[in-house]
Amino acid sequence: MKTTGVVRRIDDLGRIVIPKEIRRNMKIKDGESMEIFVDNDYIALKKYSCLDDLVNISKELVESISNEFKKNVFITDMNKIIAWSGNDRKIYYDKNISSYIYNKINERKMINIVDERIELIDGKDIVCNFLMFPIIANGDVKGSISIMSEYDSITTNEEQIIKVIAQFLGKQVEE
């Protein structure tokens, strides 16, 4: 943890204003949930992702699907890729998603792209076949699950599996 040199007062409602520059650098959006940690004299804030609790099961799900279909499969929260299985894991895993993917997730519908260039993470685009379903819990978008391949098309069977997994993860977040 590093110090920023910024000092803020707490108002009478217990609020602290986080400077715009820090919010911009950490990609914290208005209304985004923050987790509070307390340790002796320290209070720390962390961006909250309800999918963090499901990282282990997410990794197992993407691994199983990827092994079966021989394609890249990944799960995102609203900020980064939290589970990846297939080729190029070192390039994509635990990286922030691009604004393009963020906007597509927020459209709250299936995205099916055939042989087009897409930007998965900032500064890294790829020509591929790509299918994405949003993960929706309690009416809010929490992330997405995607399958992609540079060479093979996405089949109807694969589409149905990805859709079911998106619904399953949404139900898990609700509980």
Q: Each predicted region: which residue ranges?
A:
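A short beta-strand signature within small-molecule sensing/ligand-binding domains used
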Residues: D125-P134
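Intrinsically disordered, low-complexity terminal regulatory regions
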Residues: V7-A83
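Juxtadomain coupling helices with adjacent low-complexity linkers
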Residues: V55, K59-S64, I97-I101, M148-E175
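Cytosolic beta-strand hydrophobic patch enriched in CBS
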Residues: F74-T76, F133-I136
